[in-house]
Amino acid sequence: MTDADFQNWLKRGGRFVALVEVQTSPVRYLSTVAYTTLPTDTPANRVYSPVVAGGVALSESLPLDGSATRSGGDIEIHNEDGALDGWLSDVWTNRRVRVFVGDVTWPRADFRLIFDGIAAGLESRTAGRLNITIRDKLQRLNTPVSETLLGGARIMSKIRKFLP
């Protein structure tokens, strides 16, 4: 599919679907409506669970001073029956999240990537819903490189001996 074909599809409106892939263990394949990849797709016959409520909310800013800013958003998940409550005990922080858009009739390869970032976490803000907080990849710079702490009382007492 060419860029022109995709732009034409956006203008005329089709059977829109957003596909969300979250690299948790196991990988979560989510969508706004039921979608299964075609037998000729790679990977073939992958099922995306139709649990995404509405769309994907993203916000961005472009500071005039050229500084880097983090963008973020939210993906709301249907969980009215509580079937996905177990997800709350999974590790979601810093897991890759990719969001694609396309038409439900298209092969997976024709979908367009609209977001490639990370999850900042999963929580439940209201009854019957889960929320995946998403951030751009700059969020990875906001985590410790090492869990090792330098310093401490013992080391500081030795350093103080050399201070005036």
Where are these regions (language model features)?
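Juxtamembrane "anchor/assembly" segments of surface/extracellular structural proteins
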Residues: 1-164
